[in-house]
Curated annotation (Swiss-Prot):
Residues 1-17 form the signal peptide. This is Putative chitinase 2. Disulfide bonds join C24-C49. GO terms for biological process: carbohydrate metabolic process; chitin catabolic process.
Length: 466
């Protein structure tokens, strides 16, 4: 089942030759979750995403530099996340600056003068290269809000223009590529019209990441239960489909547009427990106290017997447990959102955030949400092939190094070492041959599955019930 394409005049249905970007947020606090749900960089499958966004760095009080990570664990995190490229050399590493609670004072100070912008731009390029990042994400929440003066709307464009120019003219170091510049934006009209010069910014960045979530929450007034990330809706423009159209009409080219997909739910406490239909009055946040409930927690609630309900008009699920109402996404709904990207040849998706998926597989298979996104983008064979190419390359590098060592041992007439290295080479070649056989079988199985078609789960099927 495919969504109605909203860009019919521009595009044909289906873009099978296109590769879609998968930007995946990984936040530093993922390390501090309890052991059952914490996600360390070493446990990330580096082929799930095309870009990793590490959040969030903070601009210091001077507006000229980023603050140093405040403890050893965070300092070491840069190195650990970048090491994923040893397994997948094509994985791009993006550093995100800002976020909800780390934006306002630093950004306003940064753009307060032309001199600050020029200094910061030169400094950040050196910083990104030193820490082996491939790009920068600007997540200012938001110009002209929370004490930011109205002039910051224009000055943010000045910052973006300067960064884009310096990124473009940078003399690229050996084995490096040009730095990527992305902008993460709130798509809602209440922010969009006041905070952003959309054309001015979008024309200079490589990608525009739209946060297609948190459309509703405990901050609403009047407070009523509503899903925070509906795909469609007939009675409100606050839905992914309509907001994407709005931003395209505002001047964002579709090949730059990245749609955000949440891996968390938003909860409410119902005013009256037996009045739980969408739009019912609420008195505050639910058990998450406004922080959001990760999928790796929600899946246990559903597996425990709480009935999953579905909003067909909005194409998203919700649950009611006592007086708590939770709107969230499941594998079906994120697959439909990814299909919207595929069907309209948008640039890709932004996952917020990777550590909120069921990455340990405690409710079933590992990475259920991320795999649903990959299938929705018709990128599963790309995912499989990337893993296989990397494994083959790794073995060939090991064999090459072993052969170099073997030549050295022979030159030194170290017969014991020669015999040992010859055996190692035979073992590696045998392992490679076995791995190639396994990979061929895995690819065959994957292709057979795709030939049968990967359809959306039935609406009545409860997620994580298998």
């Amino acid at each position: 089942m495919y969504l109605t394409i909203w860009l019919v005049p521009l595009l044909a249905v289906g873009t099978w030759g296109q590769k879609f970007n998968r930007f995946c947020h990984y936040n530093s606090w993922a390390l501090s979750r309890n052991p059952q749900h914490g996600l360390v960089p070493e446990d990330i499958d580096p082929f799930l995403c095309t870009h990793m966004i590490l959040g969030f760095a903070e601009i210091d009080e001077s507006g000229l530099r980023l603050k140093d990570p405040n403890h050893y664990q965070q300092q070491y995190l840069y190195q650990r996340i970048v090491r994923l490229r040893r397994i997948n050399p094509r994985l791009n590493m993006i550093l995100s600056v800002g976020g909800w609670d780390k934006s306002q004072e630093g950004y306003s100070k940064l753009v307060s003068s032309r001199e600050n912008i020029i200094f910061f731009t030169k400094w950040i390029i050196t910083y990104l290269r030193r820490h082996d990042f491939d790009g920068l994400d600007l997540d200012w929440e938001y110009p002209t809000f929370k004490g930011s003066p109205m002039v910051d709307k224009k000055k943010f464009v000045d910052l973006v223009e300067n960064l884009a120019y310096e990124f473009d003219i940078e003399e690229i170091p050996d084995i490096k590529w040009k730095l990527t510049l992305t902008w993460t934006a709130d798509p809602l009209e209440s922010v969009r019209t006041s905070a952003y010069d959309i054309k001015g910014i979008a024309s200079k960045v490589h990608y525009v990441n739209l946060k297609m979530y948190d459309f509703h929450g405990h901050w609403d007034d009047p407070l009523r239960v509503n899903h925070h990330s509906p795909l469609t809706s007939s009675n409100s423009p606050r839905n992914v489909n309509e907001l994407a159209k709005t931003w395209v009409k505002a001047g964002v080219r579709i090949e730059k547009l990245i749609l955000g997909i949440p891996f968390f739910g938003r909860s409410f406490t119902l005013k009256t427990a037996n009045m739980s239909a969408p739009g019912s009055p609420a008195v505050g946040p639910g058990s998450d106290f406004g922080d959001g409930i990760p999928i790796h927690n929600l899946c246990h609630i559903i597996r425990g017997g709480t009935k999953e309900l579905y909003l067909p008009e909005k194409k998203v699920p919700y649950i009611v447990s006592g007086s708590e109402w939770i709107g969230y996404d499941n594998p079906r709904s994120v697959m439909e959102k990814a299909q919207l990207v595929f069907n309209n040849a948008l640039a890709g998706v932004m996952i917020y955030s990777l550590d909120m998926d069921d990455h340990h597989g405690t409710c079933g298979k590992k990475w259920p949400m991320m795999m649903a996104v990959i299938h929705g983008l018709n990128a599963y064979m790309e995912y499989i092939d990337s893993k296989h190419k990397s494994l083959e390359l790794t073995y060939n590098k090991k064999i090459l190094r072993a052969r170099v060592s073997l030549r050295n041992y022979r030159r030194r007439n170290q017969q014991g070492k020669v015999a040992e290295m010859e055996q190692r080479i035979r073992n590696l070649e045998q392992e490679l041959q076995q791995s190639m056989g396994n990979m061929a079988y895995e690819r065959q199985q994957a292709q057979a599955m795709l030939n049968r078609g990967v359809s959306l789960p039935p609406i009545e099927q409860q997620s994580w019930s298998w």
